[in-house]
């Protein structure tokens, strides 16, 4: 039975539980700069500690323990450690050349662990990136944008494709702050499904609401 069929069947019976936070849980491990570098070929001198997506390559044991802790607690769906694993966010660290490996290995790791528990699912996480299309990065020039839609779409396509190739059941556009960014994420997810022929992969979107009027950071409701 295809993942979509299993998910649909379970959703018709009960609420499925998604795992919890990744970043704050990783902080509890007390990792140092070396844990984020290890044998990676990185020319940048930027501090990498806190770039948690790198851990799927440098400390997969930590990410595996995190996945298992949520599955042991009863999660039906675990999320990959790929929240910032697209070229836009990784370029801030000089590690954009690693995004294909991060997404593929992150998906494979979560897939392997989920399969050990049986009837559990993997959501490939795609975060909002560090650039928003609805908001200028220059208060003096509100018409300016730090990135174009096409640039964002291409970065998301690259990420989504590797997540699907790595075996995720779901593509999760997570904590959306800007609906235009989310639109690019959904378009990229559809592209990845069509390109790989894995039409059973589901698409989910979660948004971060910042005030009582149900507005996201970019001001839309």
Specify the residue positions occupied by each region the protein language model found.
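Domain-level signal for soluble alpha/beta catalytic cores
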Residues: 1-221
